[in-house]
Amino acid sequence: MRFQHPDGSVVHLAYCTNVHPAEDLDGVRSVLREYAEPVRQRLGRSTLGIGLWLARDAARTLVGDATALRALRAELHDRGLEVVTLNGFPYRGFGGAVVKHRVYRPDWTERERLEHTTNLAEILAALLPDDTVEGSISTLPLAWRTPLGSARAHAALKALGILAERLAVLRQGSGRSIRVGLEPEPGCVVETAADATGVLTSPGAPSHDSIGVCLDTCHIATQFEDPDTAIDTLLSAGIPIVKAQLSAALHAQVPHRLDVRQALAAFAEPRFLHQTRTRTRDGIVLGTDDLQEALIDSGLPRTAPWRCHFHVPLHAAPEPPLASTTDVLRAALARLVGGPVPLTRHLEVETYTWHTLPAAQRPHNSKLLADGIAAELAFARDLLTDLGLKEAEA
């Protein structure tokens, strides 16, 4: 979906297809047919933006087969779909029964991460619409927080530098500018905007021409970051926000109550990691690596609100006594695109947890899932039009 900002520029809104974790190219094409096109039809749009997730095997196929890449581009066009952004964070296996910490491998100290991201950039340059010259890719924020050590930290920065050089060559050869954004996430080496600034302004850091940050509003909320402060931190350091992921975290205002913890327990599922945080009265953020840890006697204080890294549908907050952090989403979006110029032009709704919601809220067939995704996009659309942006067809 495209929107015209009051300054005349185009802002793109998409939904991320990692909610349909296809591992190979046939699976990707099935996603377009069974989900993405039906979502577009539900919204009554001639064109819908999607943020493709391409697992390792699908990406390797497309890079190695120009005919397959052209066919995918043609199918996107025929189904009324367009791609200006990719989710490059999960490498493969995102549909596994247990993902948890596996999603952080390979990290930026490993060659596979660099090669995969390079492949994604080449693919995106070929998939961009004819009238679009800028693409974005979100990626792992270096690594899980296990201390990198100086040698591994140097290797990660070196890999990002090589990527920046490759993106410059791609830009010169294709005329398309592909930028990659580290996506700060609770529990990782880069958890916050301040962490990202520290990494991307350190000696040996890559040029900001092609390497920046992807802001995820669920992650900001989970870490109790103030959106304005986070954005100011990046802008003051000259770090571009190449993309923003529109998402909401799970919020428990009074976790000391038994009924609240019982409600939270319904979200403590085995597939994904649900980092949980609280902020003490003196502003210190404490947390656990997973919700289940917080619910047992983990030492996490119950005297202040908890927030959990569980992406809940934007339009459908959980039932009381729980809530979601759409207030953080609204504040971030107002700052990102509500000013005189947009601070990013790529927005992506990312709720990959539909299949792991409590049973009463979970869509039990493809039709209901498409309904839910369309409702989320309609919610995001309304937020944008309330900020003065106007819908525009491709």
Question: Which residues does each predicted region cover?
Answer:
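N-terminal pre-domain/capping segments
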Residues: 1-126, 132-135, 208, 360-394
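Active-site acidic/histidine proton-transfer and metal-coordination neighborhood
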Residues: 2-5, 97-212
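Hydrophobic faces of well-ordered beta-strands that scaffold small-molecule active sites
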Residues: 11-17, 46-52, 82-87, 133-139, ...
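Acidic-and-aromatic substrate-binding clefts and catalytic sites of carbohydrate-active enzymes
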Residues: 21-30, 54-68, 145, 187-191, ...
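Distinct, well-ordered alpha-helical segments
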Residues: 25-33, 62-66, 151, 156-167, ...
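Flexible glycine/acidic-rich beta-alpha junction loops that bind and position SAM and/or redox cofactors
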Residues: 90-99, 138-140, 145-146, 218-224, ...
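Acidic/histidine-rich catalytic cores of soluble enzymes
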Residues: 167-292, 303, 312
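Flexible, acidic glycine-rich loops studded with aromatic residues
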Residues: 286-389
